[in-house]
Amino acid sequence: MVSFQGKSRTRLKRDGQQWMVDRMIQETGRPFHFQVEGRGRLPRSVRRHVMISKHMGRAAQRMQIIAEEEESVGHMTTALNRYFDASTLYAHAQHVIFENNAEKSYLHAASLRCFDHVRQLAPYRIEHINIDWSGGVLSGNLHLANTTKPAPLVFYIPGCDQTKEMFPHPLLNQALQRDMHIFSFDGPGQGESNLRGIKLTPTNYEEAASAAIDYLISRPEIDPKLLVVYAMSFGSHWGVRIASKDSRVHALAAPWASYCEKYHLLDDEAPRWKQLFMYLTGVTTEADLDEIADAMSVRGMVGAIACPTLLAVGEYDPRSPLEEVYEIFDELTCPAELWVFADQHHAVSLARPNAEANYQSDSHDMALDWLRDRCDGKPMANERQVVYLEPASGHGPYAPAVSRRRRWYEEG
């Protein structure tokens, strides 16, 4: 172990590229996804990756103070919004620390405390759920719709840079707007699981998710036959694996594709992803991480998925080469459709590119509409089709005139 940017961990071959990441952070205000236009959410005071936790943490502290002041004078809706913002900022601040140290513990605990206020102020019931699993504890937030009979449940799987507190926002809950409950999960490699020392393996996320499903379908509020999985970004990798293993999944929506071979993310993208996964997996050598990454492949698994499935990818997502996504799509034997967002990268959007916050992305609306339709038994609009979405065309995925083709130069 060596000291790297003030943190103790194994030195990696790609660490020599850190100066390029720091330069991109200065120029873009983003810790990753440098392809996106416009400046990101990082404060301009951040000049290096190692500065992110402190400066985002200070921004979170300021937001928390505002939330407390607004709550003290009875402005409860404003307080809820600011507590949610503070919780998210604290969560982003802790994410970039790739070891369990005092700073990460402080920031993550502050995120949870702020979200406790969100739960108390929300216009519906949000339960913090703990589930015993494999000698440890898994956690999730269960957002309960105000329904009088058992309703569908959306099992939400965040990405590897997110926590369960980041989505949904209680005042813009796209699942509840469609009369569905939603459970946001901190599985292995995420949020509370990281702080508890639950390390990620190639297979334990789907095992943990199945344990959570065991509990959730026992709840009287939830219709056990209508449990759908909404898996975003790296969560889409885990969502594909869960759907291939657990027959209780009624439908799967997996946008912001991350199901391709993992060397695209770990070796072709910014080096911070390999640094992150050293922490998430707890391995001590780069060779061990490469072995785990190889074992994460979904090839040969996707054919076992039986439920209706939606995949969505940016045409030029560096972690998800389009031809490889097509190969995975063609392996599916279930009712399935694939949406390709022309000229976009990872965080695809039809109506709100560069949304300021994740919870505002129109990807949530589109995915949850698609899942609600599956719960209602509606036929798929584009079964076994690739839909090529060009925002400039003005057409969404359900328009009769939308293009159905795989490549920009084809007719369709």
State what each model feature region is.
Residues 199-221, 241:
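Alpha/beta-hydrolase active-site loop
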Residues 241-291, 307:
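Hydrolase active-site cap/lid region
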